[in-house]
């Protein structure tokens, strides 16, 4: 049996990435304060359709993701369909795979095209860290259910008497991994210690990311893939990511204190991604349908892979597991790639993965390979900056990476690119695209 992955439909046509778009990414409680993930999702999908001059009625499926779920609209995908002029019969469902969510939505649409069930679909994701599902304590939740069944005033009074003042306080969304109790920042700190990653190296990577992202915005390269967002009350607009340090100074990074291990730590707010609001989406078609409609795709999906590892130790190593599998399925080696886009959740996590890419020992012991994945050529790596600068709305990052690497390859005359990410739960994702 061949290890090669055939990302084609029954007619042998490739899966085309026709277009991609995102909102600007904004730090928590800034430009998108009060704007829900659903509203951002509708905003970007509608603008993507307008820019692409694609009739919404032609969309056969929309798969969309959200990590921080809102009880009021649990199926964000269906609400986007109903809010953007698509046919009411358009298939729509929501997915979640932590920080790899829109990798999953993209693959789901691609596989629907591969099986011949559809010809055109939209994938993406959105998250808001500013509009959050604030919960209640377990005791209050229990009491509220009992109140629905209580018939007399006396019964209701007895229920209220079970509650203390603390039970009435709101409960913010959990930031820790359910299985381990560790936050992502604590996991990054764990990885920094495991792989002996210095504070200086983490700060240097963050500085590089901000510097390159600022240069990219100044060059105008992102204007066609980042929309101008107008938000209520429509007196202001946002047209650029607001986390990027325009005058990044490496020396200033050293001034920040560790955020997760106050005494011995090295992970700080400056070398981590901030809580971020934003949305992104891509249009996928069969190669034949794209050609028939007159589109010139920005890229094609060559291979993809998802992996999972143990959550107790260094669980943000997803790229080191998913990338070699995607490369194998594409019949490629790391050195064959033109560009590499790796999600920078934390500088420590990114550097740990880069280190393991180059490790023969890791390849032998963890991957069952007789050679390392390969040394990363920094002239190919996150050449426009990464998540440390742009920010990280959890469900939106995957399709941001896919669009960005495709468009940059297009500017360079084509080639192949890797987009890869770690994710909570020990998950990993990787996709290889080819651009003509």
UniProtKB/Swiss-Prot annotation:
One GO process term, biological-process aspect: fatty acid beta-oxidation
CDD domains in alphabetical order: thiolase (cd00751)
Q: Does the keyword Lipid metabolism apply?
A: yes
Q: What is its EC number?
A: 2.3.1.16
Q: Which residues form the active site?
A: 99 (acyl-thioester intermediate), 392 (proton acceptor), 422 (proton acceptor)
What does the record give under GO molecular function? acetyl-CoA C-acetyltransferase activity
Q: Which domain of life is it from?
A: Bacteria
The record's section on PROSITE patterns has: THIOLASE_2, THIOLASE_3
**In which pathway is this protein known to take part?**
Lipid metabolism; fatty acid beta-oxidation
User: What are the record's GO terms for cellular component?
Assistant: cytosol
* UniProt-listed InterPro entries: Ac-CoA_C-AcTrfase_FadI, Thiolase, Thiolase-like, Thiolase_AS, Thiolase_C, Thiolase_CS, Thiolase_N
Coarse class of the protein's main subcellular location = cytoplasm
Q: Which Pfam families match?
A: Thiolase_C, Thiolase_N
Which Cys-Cys disulfides exist here? none
> What is catalysed by this protein?
an acyl-CoA + acetyl-CoA = a 3-oxoacyl-CoA + CoA
* Keywords associated with the record: Acyltransferase, Cytoplasm, Fatty acid metabolism, Lipid degradation, Lipid metabolism, Transferase
What's the subunit arrangement here?
Answer: Heterotetramer of two alpha chains (FadJ) and two beta chains (FadI).
Q: Which HAMAP family match?
A: FadI
Q: Briefly, what is this protein's role?
A: Catalyzes the final step of fatty acid oxidation in which acetyl-CoA is released and the CoA ester of a fatty acid two carbons shorter is formed.
Q: Record's family?
A: Belongs to the thiolase-like superfamily. Thiolase family.
**What name appears for this protein in its UniProt entry?**
3-ketoacyl-CoA thiolase
State the species of origin.
Answer: Shewanella oneidensis (strain ATCC 700550 / JCM 31522 / CIP 106686 / LMG 19005 / NCIMB 14063 / MR-1)
Gene of this entry: fadI
């Amino acid at each position: 049996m061949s290890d090669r992955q055939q990302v084609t439909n029954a007619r042998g046509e490739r899966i085309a990435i026709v277009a991609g778009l995102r909102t600007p990414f904004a730090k928590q409680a800034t430009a998108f304060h009060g704007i829900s993930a659903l509203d951002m999702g509708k905003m970007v999908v509608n603008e993507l359709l307008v820019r692409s001059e694609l009739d919404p009625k032609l969309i056969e499926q929309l798969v969309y993701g959200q990590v921080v779920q809102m009880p009021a609209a649990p199926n964000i995908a269906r609400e986007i369909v109903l809010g953007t002029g698509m046919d009411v019969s358009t298939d729509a469902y929501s997915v979640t795979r932590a920080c790899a969510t829109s990798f999953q939505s993209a693959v789901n649409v691609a596989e629907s095209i591969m099986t011949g069930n559809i010809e055109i679909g939209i994938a993406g994701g959105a998250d808001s860290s500013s509009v959050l599902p604030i919960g209640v304590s377990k005791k209050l939740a229990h009491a509220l259910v009992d109140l629905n069944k209580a018939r007399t005033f006396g019964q209701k009074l007895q229920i209220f008497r079970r509650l203390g003042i603390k039970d009435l306080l709101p409960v913010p969304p959990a930031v820790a991994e359910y299985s381990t109790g560790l936050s992502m920042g604590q996991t990054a700190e764990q990885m920094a210690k495991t792989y002996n990653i210095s504070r200086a190296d983490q700060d240097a990577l963050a500085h590089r990311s901000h510097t390159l992202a600022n240069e990219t915005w100044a060059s105008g390269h992102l204007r066609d893939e980042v929309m101008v967002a107008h938000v209520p009350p429509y007196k202001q607009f946002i047209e650029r990511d607001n986390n990027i340090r325009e005058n990044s100074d490496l020396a200033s990074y050293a001034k920040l204190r560790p955020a997760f291990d106050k005494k011995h730590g090295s992970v700080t707010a400056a070398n981590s991604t901030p809580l971020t609001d934003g949305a992104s989406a891509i249009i996928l078609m069969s190669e034949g349908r794209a050609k028939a409609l007159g589109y010139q795709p920005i890229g094609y999906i060559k291979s993809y892979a998802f992996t999972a590892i143990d959550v107790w130790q260094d669980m943000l190593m997803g790229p080191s597991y998913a990338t070699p599998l995607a490369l194998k399925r594409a019949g490629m080696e790391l050195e064959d790639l033109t560009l590499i886009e790796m999600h920078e959740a934390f500088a420590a996590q990114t550097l740990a993965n880069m280190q393991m890419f180059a490790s023969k020992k890791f390849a032998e012991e963890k991957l069952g390979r007789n050679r390392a994945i390969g040394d990363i050529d920094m002239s190919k790596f996150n050449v426009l900056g990464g998540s440390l600068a742009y920010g990280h709305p959890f469900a939106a990052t995957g399709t941001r990476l896919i669009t960005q690497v495709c468009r940059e390859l297009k500017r360079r005359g084509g080639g192949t690119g890797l987009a890869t990410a770690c994710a909570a739960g020990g998950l990993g994702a990787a996709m290889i695209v080819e651009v003509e």
